[in-house]
């Protein structure tokens, strides 16, 4: 917990916090009065240290108390004076102990939270709309909660999954619209004719699909020029044209908007996306596959980098003009680059190359996610590696008075 400004020195708030924590009844699950149950096993290691040992400068506001011989039942505790960079600041403890930090400003508090390697859930209590907007724009976590508790995620309302080291691999939020995408392997299918699916689309999006991308869409126009410069076949150019249209539709209807599918009056449950850096390794295959993947990333506004043994004429110029970093390098140099990514973290999209060699190079690092599905024309699938999801839940009333907050797309 980070207390900002005057609340950090408020005796009234401190009394309320102590009262709230002390009011919890600790007991076994079969006891109806229990609010806090046992640990899954006896406290040991870092958790036992968190429950019993203070770091320099810290003090107990409420000291945890062991309640049984097994070491699984503990009365919750609160420690004050947690310093930036200390063990209690940086480490996750799965037990009934709360650490309190202080910050002079909201930005300082956000920085303290974002310094942690993990980013599963985060919450804010504030009645200032500007503070809420600022916090929503800067905090790094997969599930955000405003003016309510930060647990109890419900399927569809608050799809569950984190950022940073709170997520491992190429999966997506449980209970969200993309969860099954990460559990399957996608292959391309013959594209449907535009008239097969545009009837149900909004007029503006339907018009885009009917006409396919033209010069009015700079991302698509640049990609098509690159394909022509690389002497792609007419069939490949047609496939690329339809893939680019699929990207535009996916962006306008899913990835580039903020959606609240629940429509509740007293609670806002927004789902949105943020672009993330991706390194693409192209080994072999159709040049339009590389152009198509790069264009998908550019559509999301992600920072895209490309590595390949060589580039067809015009492709390197296309990438450079679009702001994409690119390297012509052999497999040995690529593996060295992948090892560097293992140290810094990131996502890798593999095209026409052996995933095992790259997996060996990154050494199983949990900070790297590998995507090696065949390239597909569906934007709803191909754009996902360039995005991360965020669920935002806001209590939309104050003592029954409606109070809506604008939740914007992430930059």
Where are these regions (language model features)?
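Long, low-complexity segments enriched in small/aliphatic residues
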Residues: 45-58
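Diglycine-centered glycine-rich loop/turn motifs
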Residues: 60-65
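Conserved C-terminal structural/oligomerization subdomain of aldehyde/semialdehyde dehydrogenase
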Residues: 2-6, 15-29, 33, 37, ...
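Amphipathic, non-membrane alpha-helical segments that mediate helix-helix packing
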Residues: 4, 10, 40-44, 48
